[in-house]
Amino acid sequence: MPGPRPRKGPKTSGQGAETAKQLGLFVEFNPEDMLLGVDETEDDGDLEAELLALTGETASRSRKPAPKGQAPLPMAHIEKLAADCMRDVEEDEEEEGLEDDADLLTELQEVLGEDEEAGLLDGSEAASPDLCEEKTWDNTELPVEQAACQQAVPAAAQAGGPRGLQALLEERIRNYREAAASAKEAGEAAKARRCERGLKTLQSQLATVRKGGKICEDEIPPPVALGKRPPAPQERAIKNPEIDSPGPCAMEPGNLSQPESSLPAIAPLPDSDPDPQALLLARQREYKAAALDAKRAGDLDRARELMRIGKRFGTVLEALEKGQPVDLSGMPPAPADLKALPQASKASSATQGLSPAVEQMQPVMASDLPATPVAPAEPTTVLDALQQRLNKYREAGIQARANGDERKARMHDRIAKQYQDAVRAHQAGQKVDFAELPVPPGFPPIPGLEPRKGSEQDSVAATLATAQKLASEDAALVDDDEESDTPAQAPLAKKPAQTLVSPSHLLTEPKASSSKESLSPSVREQVTLLEARKLQYQRAALQAKRRQDLEQAKSHLRVAKSLEAQIIQARAGQPIDLSKVPSPLTDEEGDFILIHHEDLRLSQKAEEVYAQLQKMLQEQQAKCLLFSKQYMHQGNVAETTRFERLAEDRKKQLEILQLAQAQGLDPPSHHFELKTFQTVRIFSELNSTEMHLIIVRGMNLPAPPGVTPDDLDAFVRFEFHYPNSDQAQKSKTAVVKNTNSPEFEQVFKLNINRNHRGFRRVIQSKGIKFEIFHKGSFFRSDKLVGTAHLKLERLEKECEIREIMEVLDGRKPTGGKLEVKVRLREPLSSQDVQTVTENWLVLEPRGL
């Protein structure tokens, strides 16, 4: 048997900690020392030896001896570090020799030339505000000019890149530009965007080649097919016989300020000439350079006028970039060919002499025809007559804009757009309703139409009526994009808005329009209402299209088309069901965007006043629309129009209030007026064959024996004895638990026949019976709480009955109440006319 194991001696203190440290436990470490190597930064022999080897110095006697066991850094590593240091020095020396690089010097000279030209106009900013304005415009158009200049720079002037590659890129750029223009004219937006992306790639590659860089030829976009472009109108352009390419864009910066004075007279370009964009850019730069020379010579008036003329080239260039044909027959001549302008005393007359030349250079959408004379000649064809009237309205719009009457100018521009659509439709072989086109005063009728008696007076009256209508609609139309400095802007290609009729109806259309005057007043009111509603939906479709909401735009256009059919039906004397006319649109989002500035903060009281006023205006607008809808279903056109105008007025007042709040103004002064309205109540959402029963709530219902009021689980059952007692319509509500005042709010649809004799008998004698029950448990049946009875005689003159009935136990009142409603579309025997008195909010106009 083994003996007892010998006892171990007691462990000395601290021996367990040493064992833990040997195992890696409780090791103290400093993260900063691990990252920075603090222990190795001082008194490290290896690092000192490496430093001495790099610097070539000898070790100091006072230094500590390097620890044994660590070898110095190998010499091969040291030589590699030294070679790297020497290599950096050589690269710096190579960069110092870049000043002899011809490519970089050429690029630097181009940049400095543009900066010098821009800096020459800075000296006279204080003396001439107009020149400062023109300088700002010049800087904004600089990228366009640089792009055109880069396109026109000859290959001999480029220091880097092969000429063949550069010529290929330039030819490919012209190909993509023509393809993009052709796609835009054909209405192919996707193809136009693809061509524009390829054009940007080609332009960046051309810029790289011109700077001497290299590009991968495989990345050059391939040529695109131009396709069959639509027959464009004949264009008249200008040409300098001595200039075969847009050379003025390739002028050196030093010669920019010296315009060429040897330019010959302007001659029309043949069909084989290049794109007129380069000619326009060249002429624009000539005018800028001439303005710079005039400014240096001290002739600020001439410089200002030349800059104004140069500005107007931008409008034509924009139209040209959009793919629209441009008439260059009226382009101003070279600045050297213009006579010197007089001093400031005659500056205004010189402006009038130079401006028409530029105003004639505008985009055109039809064939080039002579200007309309003061006394128009007798047209031979329909196209001639349309073009004469189009030119007349264009001239009227330009003249109105020159006089500062933007409202009248926009009106003439819209009429001109109608004629442009008619010209396109006629050229495409479509049929146009010429009777709807306004006729300028004194113009002969369109060939093929029989002149009516007193045609001159009728045309003048029709023109005045159309002008007045367009002027009144100007404030509501959202066409701010048309308010530009362009005398006449070519519209986008779209379908003509005129009604298409057959040629046989052209001669009978005046008779049909004259028969409109013989319509009865009620029918005339219906036609006016339908036309206004159609115009409203067309405007809404246009706004939805501008917001890129194509589905909403299509929906509004379908409604407008259906209204057009109803208008034709009304003019033909057929009856119209106004209850089926679409309701007026409500703009929940508003017609404008409010910009709230951070520095404009209203007081808390002002914010509350604005909120209350806006709430009241919104409620009044909703009431007006509701009343208008009710009268529309009754067929009362006059009252419908009246309430629609009131709703429009409330909407305008709300917009004015929101705009004033956004500008940080104080709330406007306002007062209230008592207005009394005679309204006809109708529930248009109901059909004539249904009646709605609404069980709203129970109040303080009695509990059956053995049930406390808080444990009442109530539900309501009803019976409507129609069409007969055996086939009575029955239903019940859901169970509301644990309350004696349940809220049901349930709607039941009951089928009825308003003209049935049995329905009238039920309405007058029986009514609807209600029974309130307490829901039983699994082994207990439902317990009756009480009954109620609703009489329906008031439905003869009212379309809604609201009753709070007493709950009875047999014939004994229980103290409980039951609230119910019954609704019909309209009363059975008469109209539900109600008199409503409103406190009408009126905002007082602000003083100037």
Swiss-Prot record:
Gene: Cc2d1b
Family from the record: Belongs to the CC2D1 family.
Ranges for domain C2: 666-805
Record's protein name: Coiled-coil and C2 domain-containing protein 1B
Record text on subunit structure and interactions: Interacts with CHMP4B.
Compartment list: Nucleus
Main location: nucleus
Basic residues bias locations: 1-10
Disordered, as annotated region: 1-21, 53-75, 217-276, 326-353, 433-460, 476-523
Cellular component per GO, a single term: cytosol
One GO process term, biological-process aspect: negative regulation of transcription by RNA polymerase II
Short name of one Pfam family: C2
Biased composition (Pro residues): 438-448
Stretches assigned to coiled coil: 165-193, 600-626
Record's compositionally biased regions (Low complexity): 487-498, 509-522
UniProt-recorded Gene Ontology molecular function terms: DNA-binding transcription repressor activity, RNA polymerase II-specific; RNA polymerase II cis-regulatory region sequence-specific DNA binding
Residue numbers of Phosphothreonine PTMs: T586
UniProt cross-references to InterPro entries, sorted A to Z: C2_dom, C2_domain_sf, C2_Freud, CC2D1A/B, CC2D1A/B_DM14
UniProt keyword annotations, A-Z: Coiled coil, Nucleus, Phosphoprotein, Transcription, Transcription regulation
CDD domains noted in UniProt: C2_Freud-1
Residues modified as Phosphoserine: S455, S583
